[in-house]
Structure formats: structure tokens, C-alpha cells
């Protein structure tokens, strides 16, 4: 139970933690139908349909390192959602792209956000404000590239 005047209720990190955990739990209920984790979902949604993306760039988009991405991409490849190919010029450069099945699944996956939103007691305006504030917070405070 949430206690509004507790010490934790005033802590930004705790409120982010609870929100993230509970939102991901709601997504997970829908993602079971596709045999996907939330992390697999965000990786698929981060790849544009006709895009070839190297693992470093993909990691920057989703704030994951290659040690986390590599096993996840192998699982997504086994499910025929992505294909991993090496560049002829530089075999160290691993390119990720969506398969036809990966492209086909993106539309129903995008609808999950709407379903999750509809489970919350929040207006579209409030949701938009939260998204804009969080986007601003992330862009001002977290650098996910190697340009540090």
C-alpha cells in the first residue's frame, strides 16, 4: 500500500522505481502472448523496419550494453524477430535488422502501450506531460553515448 506522507513517498528514486516496476508488470502481461520480455520489446521497438543498426548504436538507443544485448539478440534471432549479420569489411561490426516476422509484430506490439495506458487512472494530457517531463529529465541527465 502506498503511504503518501512516508519518507519514501518523497524520494524521486523510489517513485521512479515503483512506477517503472508496476508499468513493466502491466506490459509483461501482454508480452507473454509474444514470448517477449519487456527488454526484448524495447529492443524490437527501437529498430526501424528497414534499418540495419550496429549493436553499439542499438545499445545507445535503449541504454543497454553489449553484454546485455548479445544474449537478448540471440534469443530474438531464435524467435525469428531479428537477424544478426557481420559486415564483410569488418567482421567485428555486427548489424541488427528486423526479419519479416519482426516487422509484422511491431504493429500489435505498439498497441500494447495504448492498452497499458487505458489501465491507468490518468488523462491523455497528464500522460503527455509526464512523458515530456521524463524525456527532458533523461536528455539533461543521462548521456548514453561514449562522448563523455
Swiss-Prot record:
The HTH marR-type domain extends over: 9-139
> What does UniProt give as GO cellular component?
cytoplasm
Inducing or repressing factors: Transcriptionally activated by CvfA.
Classification from the root reads: Bacteria, Bacillati, Bacillota, Bacilli, Bacillales
Function in brief: Activates transcription of virulence factors alpha- and beta hemolysin genes (hla and hlb). Also, activates RNAIII expression, a central regulator transcribed from the agr locus.
One MF term from GO for this chain? DNA binding
**Does the record bear Manganese in its keywords?**
no
Q: What is this protein called?
A: HTH-type transcriptional regulator SarZ
Amino acid at each position: 500500500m502506498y503511504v503518501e506522507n512516508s519518507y519514501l513517498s518523497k524520494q524521486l528514486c523510489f517513485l521512479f522505481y515503483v512506477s517503472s516496476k508496476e508499468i513493466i508488470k502491466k506490459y509483461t502481461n501482454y508480452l507473454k502472448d509474444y514470448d517477449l520480455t519487456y527488454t526484448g520489446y524495447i529492443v524490437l521497438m527501437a529498430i526501424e523496419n528497414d534499418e540495419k543498426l550496429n549493436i553499439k548504436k542499438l545499445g545507445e538507443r535503449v541504454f543497454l550494453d553489449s553484454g546485455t544485448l548479445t544474449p537478448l539478440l540471440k534469443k530474438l534471432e531464435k524467435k525469428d524477430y531479428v537477424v544478426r549479420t557481420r559486415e564483410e569489411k569488418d567482421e567485428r561490426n555486427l548489424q541488427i535488422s528486423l526479419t519479416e516476422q519482426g516487422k509484422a509484430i511491431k504493429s500489435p506490439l505498439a498497441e500494447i502501450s495504448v492498452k497499458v495506458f487505458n489501465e491507468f487512472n490518468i488523462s491523455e494530457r497528464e500522460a503527455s506531460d509526464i512523458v515530456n517531463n521524463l524525456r527532458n529529465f533523461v536528455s539533461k541527465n543521462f548521456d548514453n553515448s561514449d562522448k563523455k
